[in-house]
């Protein structure tokens, strides 16, 4: 019994010594210098906060003004025990807040503390509820409190179809920046959190300077990228000044019929006949266009089956060039212009579907195209090559769709 009591006494003494020897949760806490002037002039702009954390805990760093209002610099940040001092620079900027009576058309995400005397508090709390707080004083003077305001934020059009069809292919975003900043960014965020950068039109106002700014977005399609999928997105404009203040404005944008258009003349083949004819005869072709993309292809007339005279072009039939439309063309050696004879890539209501007031070839579909040219004048030489092409007007004639399947044709006078 005496031995048992002695052992218990020794155990209790050991536990007491262990408890007494446990280090404080939070120690060696400093903030220096005690006076800062956060105005990006390079002098006393920041204070260094240092502390020793002896056990894992969540850390709060806050500032309280003379009226008892609290401003948050770090909020419940989890940190582990560390032999080295933790250190962080405080630039005078805290989580965004509004001044009494203030109403602004943007969200303030980071803001500098106004001039004044503040009580700083550094609090550590462990998972088992142990909490330690250290406090001190900080004076802020000559702070640059002017916000990098953004006003006049607009997104147009609100519904956007990046598919190079010439209809609502681009979005214009305008804003007015009220202060020179370190960074001005505009981006689109999808539901998965993927950010799509929107470039600025640098011809209007120098980057990051006060004034009117315009951003232009095509979904990346003009650079050969696949645009983001259809859906509703949030557009963000964010400005950050030299002090570190940030403001944010948002709007929504809906993508419809988005996709990179890809189409071909099927198998690179065209039927052309007759290959020998005389003046006043008619030369006719047949080919098939395949839409090999997940987007709709806009087209216009003249429609398949139309006949040209050889001294006409598509303008004569009342269908001028239109940016973004696909048309099949017929060309020949001595033509004075590129693909003077053109036809739509389908028939309205048969191969084509109507979207709004325009006609489109649906995704992953095919259409047979026919057309004729009546030869009404003698060309410069008897033997000529005729070939077909698939034109994406004001965009490109892809190499694979240019000079497709040339046929040698002889034209004679009667």
Show where each model-derived region lies.
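Bacterial N-terminal signal peptides that target proteins for export
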Residues: 1-8
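Short, hydrophobic/aromatic beta-strand segments
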Residues: 59-63, 73, 183-187, 249, ...
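C-terminal motif of bacterial Sec signal peptides marking the signal peptidase cleavage site
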Residues: 17-19
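Asparagine-centered strand-capping/turn motif at beta-strand->loop junctions
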Residues: 288-296
């Amino acid at each position: 019994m005496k031995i048992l009591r002695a052992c218990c006494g020794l155990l209790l003494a050991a536990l007491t010594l262990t408890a007494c020897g446990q280090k404080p949760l939070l120690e060696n806490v400093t903030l220096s210098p005690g006076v800062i002037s956060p105005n990006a002039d390079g002098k006393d702009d920041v204070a260094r906060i240092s502390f020793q954390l002896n056990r894992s805990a969540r850390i709060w760093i806050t500032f309280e003004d003379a009226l008892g209002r609290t401003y948050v610099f770090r909020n419940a940040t989890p940190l582990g025990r560390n032999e080295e001092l933790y250190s962080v620079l405080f630039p005078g900027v805290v989580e965004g807040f509004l001044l009494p009576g203030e109403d602004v058309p943007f969200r303030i995400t980071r803001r500098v503390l106004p001039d004044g005397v503040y009580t700083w508090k550094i609090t550590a709390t462990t998972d088992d509820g142990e909490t330690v707080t250290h406090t001190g004083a900080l004076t802020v003077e000559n702070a640059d409190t002017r916000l990098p305001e953004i006003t006049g934020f607009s997104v147009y059009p609100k519904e956007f179809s990046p598919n190079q069809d010439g209809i609502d292919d681009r979005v214009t975003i305008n804003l007015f920046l009220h202060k020179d900043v370190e960074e001005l960014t505009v981006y689109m965020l999808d539901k998965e959190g993927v950010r799509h950068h929107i470039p600025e039109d640098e011809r209007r106002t120098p980057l990051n300077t006060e004034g009117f700014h315009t951003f232009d977005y095509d979904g990346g399609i003009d650079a050969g990228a696949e645009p983001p999928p259809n859906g509703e997105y949030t557009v963000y404009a964010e400005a950050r000044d030299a002090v570190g203040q940030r403001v944010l404005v948002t709007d929504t944008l809906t993508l419809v019929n988005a996709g990179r258009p890809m189409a071909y003349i099927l198998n690179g083949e065209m039927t052309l006949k007759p290959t020998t004819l005389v003046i006043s005869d008619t030369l006719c072709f047949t080919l098939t266009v395949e839409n090999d993309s997940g987007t709709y292809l806009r087209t216009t007339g003249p429609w398949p089956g139309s006949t040209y005279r050889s001294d006409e072009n598509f303008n004569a039939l009342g269908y001028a060039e239109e940016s973004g439309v696909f048309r099949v063309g017929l060309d020949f050696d001595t033509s004075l212009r590129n693909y003077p004879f053109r036809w739509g890539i389908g028939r309205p209501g048969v191969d084509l579907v109507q979207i709004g007031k325009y006609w489109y070839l649906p995704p992953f579909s095919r259409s047979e195209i026919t057309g004729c040219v009546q030869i009404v004048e003698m060309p410069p030489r008897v033997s000529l090559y005729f070939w077909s092409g698939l034109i994406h007007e004001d965009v490109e004639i892809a190499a694979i769709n240019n000079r497709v399947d040339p046929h040698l044709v002889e034209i004679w006078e009667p």
